[in-house]
Amino acid sequence: MTTPNANLQNSAPLPAERPTPLPRLLLSALLAAVLFMLVCGLAYPLLTTVVAGAAFPNQAGGSLVTRNGQVVGSAVLGQNFTAPRYLHGRPSMTSKTDGSGPEPYNAENSGASNWGPTNAKLQGAVQGRIAAFRQENGLGADVPVPIDAVTASASGLDPDVTLATALLQVNRIAQARGMQPAGVEKVIRAHLKGRDLGLLGEPRVNVLAVNLSLDGQ
């Protein structure tokens, strides 16, 4: 009778495992890279584009707004309204595409100032905007100015303002258009959107939608 140790001693040694040739490793890596590029760079974007176009055609196309057959803007991108007869949006810190100077609501160069809350430039800019907002809307020094009226969004392209900011502009818009303030306020409230999911954000109005409605009065 043989013992286990004897069997181990009499067994032939296992052959040494041969390393995978380098060309084969490179070929495997290349094939994996090509596969992931096709899946992640072609198949997945095409699939999401087709699904989004079928399920959400308006949003997938940019949420474009038309008037008399002409595209006048997008519901999700703000515009730089400055005339007294229009509702004004938030400040925008976007610049020209070549960086040569400011260009509010430039969708080709979205971004913010990147100034921190303690930065003297930001504090000075906000104080200047508060004074300008009060002056253009005929507000007294004791009237609180909503924060969204004097601060830019992270994208510089925010299409909405809070209801409070919109209502503070009613008298200026009404005077410029020869309307009653109640009529302007009615248009603004007709475009009021509530908080997202009933919890997030503030009640807001879309600036472009309000201005188009005002032009249609």
Curated annotation (Swiss-Prot):
Pfam families: KdpC (PF02669)
Keyword Transport: yes
InterPro entries referenced in this protein's UniProt entry, alphabetically: KdpC (IPR003820)
Region (Disordered) location: 87-117
Membrane-protein topology: Single-pass membrane protein
Gene Ontology cellular component annotations, sorted alphabetically: plasma membrane
Superkingdom of the organism of origin: Bacteria
Biased composition (Polar residues): 107-117
HAMAP family cross-referenced by the UniProt entry: KdpC
Subunit structure, interactors included: The system is composed of three essential subunits: KdpA, KdpB and KdpC.
Protein name: Potassium-transporting ATPase KdpC subunit
